Amino acid sequence: MLEAYRQHVEERAALGVPPKPLDDAQTAELVALLKNPPAGEEAFLVDLLENRVPAGVDQAAYVKAAFLAALAKGEATSPLVTKERAVYLLGTMLGGYNVAPLVELLDNAELAELAAEALKKTLLVFDAFHDVADKAKAGNAAAKAVLQSWAEAEWFTSRADVPEEIKITVFKVTGETNTDDLSPAQDAWSRPDIPLHANAMLKNERDGIYPEKPGEVGPLSQIKELIAKGNQVAYVGDVVGTGSSRKSATNSVL
């Protein structure tokens, strides 16, 4: 599995894009390796678990959340991931399959405080809110702390202040920007693979825009030169419409 993944990383690097996230089968193999890690691969395995498994309700996220929950409850062990670290990592998964284990851990005397800290930063809990509320009503101190934190929006107020000033470098795009400029229909096959699909943005030549391969790959080097100036880069078009498909393309590609 590790050899195949490293080969995949090299293939993606040749395209100028990051590797794809692990799928559920790869994540299951990763879990097995984490339980009995090969010598010399420890740091790589932990990095894959922490950074290369998608969050939310992806099937790979289900495998990851189940493994971390088992570690936290002592139902599984890994020499590389402690119970405490497992709870922390559950808290980085945004919502979805990580929520139920964290709510359950509010009743764990050893880990309740850590589970509460994780839930305080998790908003996509949906009906699990009522489970936390019920525990709070029953006197669970950790659950009460979570509700209080949500009520005070600590997930937001704990963030850094918005800077008084933001210095940007302008990426000027002449003419009208339509949906096809950002997300070409001819490249619709790659839309699920956002980094790869983004390579096709502005692939057709226009005044001031210099694609890598006209008709195939957009102005990647031109954008990299702007990034190298050290500022955030702002897309500034003469005309950028506000249709929903354009917003979707902007959200994904830009």
Can you say where each PLM-predicted feature lies in the sequence?
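Amphipathic alpha-helical packing elements
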Residues: L2-V31, N36
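Structural detector for internal amphipathic alpha-helices that build alpha-solenoid repeat scaffolds
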Residues: L15-K20, E42-Q59, L80-G95, P101-E104, ...
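Amphipathic alpha-helical scaffolding segments comprising HEAT/armadillo-like alpha-solenoid repeats
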Residues: D24-V31, A55-G74, M93-D107, V125-A136
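Short coil turns that connect the paired helices of HEAT/ARM alpha-solenoid repeats
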Residues: K35-G40, K73-V81, L105-A112, K135-G139
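Active-site-adjacent structural elements in folded domains
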Residues: L71, K83, G218-S221
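Short, charge-rich binding segments
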Residues: T77-K83, V87, T92, K224-A228, ...
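Fe-S-dependent hydro-lyases/dehydratases of central metabolism
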Residues: E117-L254
